[in-house]
Structures are given as C-alpha cells and as structure tokens.
Amino acid sequence: MANEEQSNTYSTESHQKKSFFQSLFGRFFQGELKNREELVEVIRDSEQNELIDQNTREMIEGVMEIAELRVRDIMIPRSQIVFIHTDQNLDSCLDTIIVSAHSRFPVITDERDNIAGILHAKDLLRFLRSNAEEFDLMPLLRPAVIVPESKRVDRMLKDFRSERFHMAIVVDEFGAVSGLVTIEDILEQIVGDIEDEFDEEEIVNIRQLSRHTYAVRALTDIEDFNQQFNTHFADEEVDTIGGVVMQAFGYLPKRGEEITIENIGFKVTSADSRRLIQLRITVTDEQLAEIEKAEELKED
C-alpha cells in the first residue's frame, strides 16, 4: 500500500513537472517572451519547479549578464596590476613572480603605458639550470593583446576562445593602460569566484597601506569596520561598509569617486556595474590616535 502511494505521488510530481516543462517551451517557441525580464522570470520559475537547480539558474543568468557588461566593468584596475620592467634581471623577475604567484605579467618600458609584451612565468624555468648571465628578457615576450574599455564582455570571451590567449591589456580612450582582463575574470561572472591553489584561504578585509591610509574590502562587516576604526556606523539598513558608502552617495559610485563620512575619506578603487569591490580610506591624525588608543586598550 505504501509503495502504491509513493508511486502515485511520484507520478503526480512527474506529471506536474512535465506540464510545466511543456508550458515553458511553449512560451519559447510561440514567441510569448517579449523581453529579458520575462526570460529571467521563466528561468526562476524553472528553479522553483525543480527543473533546474540554483547553480544552473545562476549560471544561466550569468551568461545573460555578460552580454550587457563592458570590459571596464570586470577588469583588474591598473593599480592592482603587477608589472615587470624590461630592465629587470632574472633574480628580480623571479622575486616578482614568487611574491605575486601570477603566471603572466605585462612587461613595460620606462614609459608605464608602453607595453613591450607579456611574460609567461614558465618561460623563465630553463634559465634556472643555465648561466643567469645569458638571460635576456625581450626575446621571451609574447605579443600583448590590447582592447578598449568599451569592448563587450561576450565579444571578449569569444576572442579569448577563438584566438587562444588568456590575458588582454585594457586601455582608455586616450590609449593609456587602465587595467587588464583575463578569461578567468569572465568565467567568474558566470560561475562565481574560481579559487586555485594559490588563492589565499583567509581574505584580509582591512589592510594598512601607510600611516593614514587603508585598503578595505567593500564587503567588510560594519561591526568589524567600527571596531577597527572606532567609528559608529549603524547597521540597521545595511550590513557592509560598501553599503554605507553607497547609501552616502545615493547611487552606485564609479571607480575614483570620493566622499567623506564622519570625517573619514572614502575613495572607490574598484567597482563593477553591480557592486563596490574595494575602497581606500584616509584617516586624520586625531582619528589615528583614537585607533591606536583603542588598540592599546584591547591589548590590556
């Protein structure tokens, strides 16, 4: 009897899913979907009816979103690029590679916007077993692919696949280097963050750059920020310091925009079309003294 009830339940659920599936494809092929919003609604209905899971839904939406993004929205900003200079010797190049743990590096001349080429870290391996005096960087460089900030991300992905390269240098309207983009940056827009064996397990949300400046991830909890900087930002409406900054602006600010909140200077150093990513904050001497005093009290 129990087996019969279980069979009937399974049959009913299967029939419901089949009916929804037929309705879904009917809307596709009969041209009922008029815009992107309706398509997104259908995809989310598919998840609720268990035709697809959450990961699949997020990937489909990610594919749709990259068609609306420009390279400037996802690029690594120039300030975060690790460059190698044409006059570096072998030991200096190896030091840069070891510290950064990257596999590809833009190589520049004395003029920062003059890209000589791209160095692959693996191309230095043969020099580890030979005389370092034979090292000559220039012949090792591969041509750099240059793309404008305005290039569509879906076109960029197509070029990565068809031309079989993995990194491109991004330039602004004046030809100055503004960032770089990799195929991984695009794939992360579709499937989420991709961590490899070199990614840090523990993410540092607040990092001191100089006596008065700090790099702060926008996703830092307000409570953690308040504790670090002896501030009193409220967390009733937003949860992160990025939310506080957006609330103060009244809109999603772009990279380079600045604002002062509670006498602390905030500058957006990284952002895309959907969210803030990284901030740089500047504190005064008085605030720094309060921070240091609070640190001393914690230690006591």
Swiss-Prot record:
InterPro entries: CBS_dom, CBS_dom_sf, CorC_N, FAD-bd_PCMH-like_sf, FAD-bd_PCMH_sub2, Ion_transp-like_CBS, Transptr-assoc_dom
Hydrolase found in the keyword field: no
Recorded superkingdom: Bacteria
Record domain CBS: where: 75-134, 140-197
Single GO molecular function: flavin adenine dinucleotide binding
Assigned protein family: Belongs to the UPF0053 family.
Protein name: Magnesium and cobalt efflux protein CorC
Organism: Pasteurella multocida (strain Pm70)
